């Protein structure tokens, strides 16, 4: 039985936190336990502990131990006019919330996605255009707010990825720099609210270490 472990540390201007996970592969089923720093610092306790059973590409069942909440996620792919449509159904029992997500891959460069919370008018439609496999442009329309969000990203052969986002509803401008490989990764984010008179930037940094046994 193969085992994978990962540790993620996060620092921002307000606090420092950590998340750890252990995953075991049992055939085509993956068993995963996730813990936050609150699980170990004060105890050990059950705070921040979540257990999950996953079959990649098919389903995920996650149990939040302290909240006694179950979250179901089911994935499937159908074909429309020979184009793959990836569907995801997510239901959280505690707040009785259901989300349906669909993504239609038109070709290698174009993708159309929609996300809808059942029983509400919350719906977002996003178009993704990938240029040359390195640059990506993503406009997103929020039907409930009648606003647009935009994201532009650029991937480099070194493994670095730079991403810029702008939310027109909140006037929030964000920048992100990340790098991921098999053993480790990091992400540095900066955001500023352009509607804020002071326009004070908020900085966060994440580091991830991966171990496979």
Swiss-Prot record:
PANTHER family associated with the record: OUTER ENVELOPE PORE PROTEIN 24A, CHLOROPLASTIC-RELATED
Source organism: Arabidopsis thaliana
A GO molecular function held by the record: porin activity
Domain of life the protein comes from: Eukaryota
Topology in the lipid bilayer: Multi-pass membrane protein
Segments in the Chloroplast intermembrane topological domain: 14-18, 43-55, 81-93, 119-122, 157-159, 180-201
Claim: Chloroplast is one of the keywords in the record: yes
Protein name: Outer envelope pore protein 24B, chloroplastic
Subunit-structure text: Homooligomers form large rather nonselective pores in plastidial outer membranes.
Function: High-conductance voltage-dependent solute channel with a slight selectivity for cations transporting triosephosphates, dicarboxylic acids, ATP, inorganic phosphate (Pi), sugars, and positively or negatively charged amino acids.
The keyword Iron-sulfur appears for this protein: no
Keywords associated with the record: Chloroplast, Ion transport, Membrane, Plastid, Plastid outer membrane, Porin, Transmembrane, Transmembrane beta strand, Transport
Record topological domains on the Cytoplasmic side: 1-3, 29-32, 65-70, 104-108, 133-144, 169-170, 212-213
Family: Belongs to the plastid outer envelope porin OEP24 (TC 1.B.28) family.
Subcellular localization, as worded in the UniProt entry: Plastid, Etioplast membrane; Plastid, Chloroplast outer membrane
Residues annotated as transmembrane: 4-13, 19-28, 33-42, 56-64, 71-80, 94-103, 109-118, 123-132, 145-156, 160-168, 171-179, 202-211
GO CC terms, sorted: chloroplast; chloroplast envelope; chloroplast outer membrane; etioplast membrane; plastid; pore complex
GO BP terms, alphabetized: regulation of monoatomic ion transmembrane transport
């Amino acid at each position: 039985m193969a085992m994978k472990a990962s540790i993620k540390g996060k620092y921002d201007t307000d606090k420092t936190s950590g998340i750890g996970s252990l995953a075991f592969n049992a055939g085509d089923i993956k068993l995963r336990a996730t813990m936050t720093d609150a699980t170990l610092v004060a105890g050990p306790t059950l705070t921040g502990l979540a257990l999950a059973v996953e079959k990649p590409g098919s389903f995920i069942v996650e149990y939040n131990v302290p909240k006694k909440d179950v979250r179901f996620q089911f994935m499937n792919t159908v074909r429309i006019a020979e184009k793959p449509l990836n569907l995801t159904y997510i239901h959280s029992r505690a707040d009785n919330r259901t989300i349906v997500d669909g993504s239609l891959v038109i070709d290698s460069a174009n993708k159309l996605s929609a996300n809808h919370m059942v029983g509400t008018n919350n719906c977002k439609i996003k178009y993704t255009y990938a240029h040359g496999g390195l640059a990506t442009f993503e406009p997103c329309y929020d039907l409930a707010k009648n606003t647009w969000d935009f994201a532009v990203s650029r991937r480099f052969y070194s493994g670095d990825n730079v991403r810029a986002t702008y939310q027109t509803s909140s006037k929030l401008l964000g920048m992100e720099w990340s790098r991921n490989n098999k053993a480790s990764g990091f992400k540095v984010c900066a955001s500023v609210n352009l509607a804020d008179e002071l326009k004070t930037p908020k900085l966060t940094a994440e580091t991830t270490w991966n171990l496979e046994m």
